[in-house]
């Protein structure tokens, strides 16, 4: 396979304008050699410190594959340690996930960063290392039986890291350095778990080109699920090491990139901290990363011996940027879709309790269901398709097939309600699942929800009606990024009176609250 290096250069030149923000880095490795390396903008606008290829940036959730790689390289067979998972979930009432299911995001557990919102956290408050395990230990149920579906969950990897450190008797930073950073030549990479103290004093920025940029104030401690800081030079060395060890079936990357599957045998799209997807017509493994003020993405196409890395110190889409580099280098053009017609609307999934919303534009559809919106194009057969998702209609029912999640949803139409009286649902509610409360206040047509729990009393969030007895709670900023976004809140009635609520988002579904 030959790369169009001129087209790649043009695509790299376009990144600062297409993905506007304070700064960023991007690089490409082909056949084990660095063929492109760029750094633009500033690591700190106020101090005028330029962004450089040696500037260390948080790679955030890209760290998950490093955790899984060290796990396999030190402990080997994960099944030998499955019994230890129970130590971290003492109140769990269903089948417990295995260690492998944690690594593959098939545990069915709710994401603990999403749950920090429901436990009363404010986006910028300090979240210490010792705050995580008590929150996880409160879990009593999950989304689904382990191994049957996919759900992104950061606490999976926090549990993995705790078991890994306990079994080896060694700190995770030392294991990273010994097993991956050293062999890969990642000379400056390190675990920087405390986000209040970023490596090289790099500043991440919230905001946008429309409203301006302001420094993100992060206060979380994460380990196992994220926390590594690395420069572009470090990350390109990692990609070169992957290529150099490609023929060794016992190499770390070969082992973590084996095709994953669900317990039923159906192929899965995520395993050992790696996403398996198709980008620009290529099968790739990789991962994204996010913290307020930062975005990162890496892709590796093993058959083509091609890798791409993009990291921003702002919140533009690193996934889209990295995808554009692959497309340019390969001369790939995405197929044009037919004009959509009659797909717009909203539906409610009775199983997850989540709202599905579909919007139309000239180029396709935007589906809002999971953490971020999915873009779909309508094929010649009239079927809207996107990355790992497609839509169909059975009468008024909307059928969503999320093959990457091993999930089929049959959602019923939800009539639109623009104005509703929140006075009926105002009051205090308690969730046994979380051992936490939800307070709703209504005044002069406005409605707001506040969460109280293990981490305090959080800010009041906006509450908007969307359908009969269905509301959305809007969370645009949280400890982790991206924020949960819109939570679907359903009213539960007994004899016509409000008895409780069911709240959920893609990362934390089906949480029941009883009226106090």
From Swiss-Prot:
Q: Could you tell me the gene encoding this protein?
A: dap
Give the record's keywords alphabetically.
Answer: Aminopeptidase, Hydrolase, Protease
Residues given in the record as substrate binding sites: 480
Protein name per Swiss-Prot or TrEMBL: D-aminopeptidase
Organism this protein belongs to? Cereibacter sphaeroides (strain ATCC 17029 / ATH 2.4.9)
Segments carrying the region annotation (Important for specificity) are 476-486
The UniProt entry's sequence similarity note says: Belongs to the peptidase S12 family.
Q: How is its activity regulated?
A: Inhibited by beta-lactam compounds such as 6-aminopenicillic acid, 7-aminocephalosporanic acid, benzylpenicillin and ampicillin. Inhibited by p-chloromercuribenzoate.
- SUPFAM superfamilies for the chain: beta-lactamase/transpeptidase-like (SSF56601), D-aminopeptidase, middle and C-terminal domains (SSF50886)
Assembly, in brief, is: Homodimer.
Question: One Pfam family from the UniProt entry?
Answer: DAP_B
**Gene Ontology terms: biological process:** proteolysis
Cited InterPro entries: Bact_CellWall_Synth/Modif, Beta-lactam-related, Beta-lactam/transpept-like, D_amino_pept/lipop_sf, DAP, DAP_B_dom
Q: Give the molecular function GO annotations.
A: aminopeptidase activity
Function, as annotated, reads: Hydrolyzes N-terminal residues in D-amino acid-containing peptides.
Active site per database record: 61 (nucleophile), 64 (proton donor/acceptor)
- The answer to keyword Nucleotide-binding applying to this record is no
């Amino acid at each position: 396979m030959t790369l169009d290096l001129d087209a790649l250069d043009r695509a790299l030149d376009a990144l600062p304008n297409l993905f506007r923000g304070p700064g960023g880095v991007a690089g490409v490795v082909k056949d084990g050699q660095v063929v492109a390396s760029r750094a633009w903008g500033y690591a700190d606008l106020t101090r005028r410190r330029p962004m450089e290829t040696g500037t260390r940036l948080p790679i955030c959730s890209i760290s998950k594959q490093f955790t899984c790689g060290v796990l396999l390289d030190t402990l080997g067979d994960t099944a030998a340690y499955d019994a230890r998972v129970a130590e971290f979930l003492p109140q769990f009432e269903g089948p417990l996930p295995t260690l492998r299911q944690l690594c593959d995001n098939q545990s069915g557990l709710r994401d603990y960063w999403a749950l920090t919102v429901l436990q009363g956290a404010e986006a910028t408050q300090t979240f210490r290392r010792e705050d995580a395990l008590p929150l996880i230990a409160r879990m009593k149920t999950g989304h689904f039986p382990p191994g049957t579906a996919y759900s992104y969950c950061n606490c999976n990897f926090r549990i993995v890291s705790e078991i890994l450190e306990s079994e080896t008797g060694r700190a995770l930073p030392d294991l990273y350095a010994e097993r991956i950073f050293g062999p890969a030549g990642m000379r400056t990479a390190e675990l920087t778990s405390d986000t209040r103290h970023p490596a090289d004093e790099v500043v991440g920025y919230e905001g946008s080109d429309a409203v301006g940029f302001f420094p993100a104030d992060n206060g979380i401690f994460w380990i196992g699920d994220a926390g590594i800081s690395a420069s572009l030079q470090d990350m390109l060395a990692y990609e070169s090491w992957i290529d150099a060890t490609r023929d060794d079936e016992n190499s770390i990357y070969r082992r973590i990139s084996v095709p994953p599957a669900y317990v039923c045998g159906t192929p899965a799209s995520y395993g050992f901290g790696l996403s398996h997807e198709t980008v620009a017509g290529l099968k790739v493994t990789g991962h994204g990363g996010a913290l307020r003020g930062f975005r990162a993405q890496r892709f590796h196409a093993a058959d083509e011996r091609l890798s791409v890395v993009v990291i921003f110190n702002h919140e533009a889409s690193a996934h889209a940027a990295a995808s554009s580099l692959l497309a340019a280098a390969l001369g790939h053009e995405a197929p044009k879709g037919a004009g959509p017609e009659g797909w717009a609307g909203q539906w409610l999934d009775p199983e997850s309790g989540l709202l599905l919303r579909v919007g139309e534009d000239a180029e396709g559809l935007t589906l809002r269901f999971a953490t971020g919106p999915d873009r779909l194009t309508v094929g010649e057969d009239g079927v809207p398709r996107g990355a790992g998702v497609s839509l169909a209609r059975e009468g008024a029912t909307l059928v969503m097939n999320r093959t990457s999640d091993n999930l089929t949803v049959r959602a019923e139409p939800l009539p639109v309600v623009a104005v509703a009286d929140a006075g009926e649902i105002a009051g205090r509610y308690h969730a046994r699942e979380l051992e936490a409360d939800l307070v709703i206040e209504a005044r002069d047509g406005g409605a707001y929800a506040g969460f109280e729990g293990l981490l305090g009393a959080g800010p009041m969030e906006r509450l908007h009606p969307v359908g009969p007895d269905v509301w959305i709670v809007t969370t645009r900023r949280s400890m982790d990024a991206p924020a949960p976004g819109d939570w679907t809140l359903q009213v539960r009635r007994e004899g016509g009176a409000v008895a409780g609520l069911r709240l959920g988002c893609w990362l934390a579904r089906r949480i029941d609250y009883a009226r106090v």
